[in-house]
């Protein structure tokens, strides 16, 4: 999955943005709902307006899960097992949505990092988010 340098890069970047992670979670979901409006179908009970408490709270859950995954890169399957089960069996989320969310998170990360969002950071986070999406989608097979 990630080499030692990429792992260090992902963890280092996460430490830099951790203080803004809740805001980033909200921005990621808001962006996903705007760019990929079909993703809204999984949230029929949410107020999907920009700045809603429900988007803010769910965004916190998303970035908290990403933070846990970063802390447990060597054990992603176990770390994300409950989320994988929830999304596959209870919520029945189409796994393509994990990739859409990852794309939106990359954009938000780039906005927050500015020039520190280097090609190396992009590649490292792309590998990380691809691995997370793959683990979340495993239950669908």
UniProtKB/Swiss-Prot annotation:
Name the PROSITE patterns on file: GLOBIN
The gene behind this protein is HBAD
**The protein, known as:** Hemoglobin subunit alpha-D
Q: Which residues form a coiled coil?
A: none
Any one of the GO CC terms: hemoglobin complex
Organism encoding this protein = Phalacrocorax carbo (Great cormorant)
Q: Does the keyword Iron apply?
A: yes
Q: Output the PANTHER family linked to this UniProt entry.
A: HEMOGLOBIN FAMILY MEMBER (PTHR11442), HEMOGLOBIN SUBUNIT ZETA (PTHR11442:SF41)
The UniProt entry's sequence similarity note says: Belongs to the globin family.
Which positions bind heme b? 58, 87
Q: What does this protein do?
A: Involved in oxygen transport from the lung to the various peripheral tissues.
């Amino acid at each position: 999955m990630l080499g030692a340098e990429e792992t260090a890069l992902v963890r280092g970047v996460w430490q830099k943005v951790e203080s803004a992670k809740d805001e980033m979670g909200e921005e990621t979901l808001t962006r996903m709902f705007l760019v990929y409006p079909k993703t809204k179908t999984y949230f029929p009970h949410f107020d999907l307006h920009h700045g809603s408490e429900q988007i803010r709270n769910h965004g916190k859950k998303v970035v908290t899960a990403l933070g846990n995954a970063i802390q447990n890169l060597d054990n992603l399957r176990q770390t994300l097992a409950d989320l994988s089960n929830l999304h596959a069996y209870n919520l029945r989320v189409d796994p393509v949505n994990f990739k859409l969310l990852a794309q939106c998170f990359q954009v938000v990360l780039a906005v927050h990092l500015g020039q520190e969002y280097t090609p190396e950071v992009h590649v490292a986070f792309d590998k990380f988010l691809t691995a997370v999406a793959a683990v979340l989608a495993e239950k669908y097979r």
